[in-house]
A protein has these predicted regions:
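Short beta-strand segments
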Residues: 27-61, 77-78
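Short, basic/aromatic recognition patches
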Residues: 3-31
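A generic structural signal for nonpolar/aromatic side chains embedded in well-ordered alpha-helices
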Residues: 23-24, 68-69, 119
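Structural motif corresponding to alpha-helix initiation and N-cap regions
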Residues: 17, 62-63
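Short solvent-exposed loop/turn micro-motifs enriched in small/polar/acidic residues
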Residues: 25-27, 40-41, 89-90, 139
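Helix-adjacent hinge/juxtasegments
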Residues: 58, 64-90
Length: 159
């Protein structure tokens, strides 16, 4: 039987797990892919927060993404680090992380509320009363927890 997750073909470009975690902590936007209608991939750009080895997203209470996750909890999440350009050259250094895992909808407010607050503070760390907004409006959002089964990171030099 073949392993579920393939090894990276260009293994010399692989990033260590700690670097993958750094990118997941610092990146601001990622792409969540689920198995959508008719078995087609459905990918959406999404804000997220990485805490305690898991990814958290918020979304509306209904829609394509939630329908897909209710049908199949398997998902893929991808982030790109900010590219760095080599001085006086065309080359860019780009790092990316791909996570495979399962997503569950957090239904207990004891789990949901702290994650919504953490997400808000990531994007509005100083100039916004995140906690008040979450307590006032948090019931209008779903909170998703992505448990990572496998991740890999890669550094490439692109021209």
């Amino acid at each position: 039987m073949e392993p579920v997750f393939r090894p990276m073909r260009r293994f010399k470009q692989a990033l260590p797990e700690e670097e993958c975690f750094r990118i997941l902590t610092s990146a601001y936007r990622g792409f969540l892919s689920v198995i959508g209608d008719g078995g087609y991939p459905y990918t959406v750009p999404i804000n997220f927060v990485f805490e305690d080895g898991k990814l958290y997203f918020h979304c509306a209470k209904e829609g394509h993404k939630l329908d897909a996750l209710r049908a199949c909890d398997k998902a893929c999440f991808t982030v790109l680090d900010e590219p760095e350009k080599e001085a006086d050259d065309w080359w860019y250094h780009v790092k990316s992380v791909i996570c495979f895992g399962r997503v569950r909808i957090l239904s207990d407010d004891a789990d949901r509320i702290p994650r919504l607050i953490a997400l808000g503070k990531k994007y509005f760390p100083d100039d916004y009363d995140t906690e008040a907004d979450v307590f006032q409006n948090g019931s209008r959002a779903e909170m998703l927890e992505f448990t990572i089964d496998h991740l890999s990171g890669k550094a490439v030099r692109e021209k």
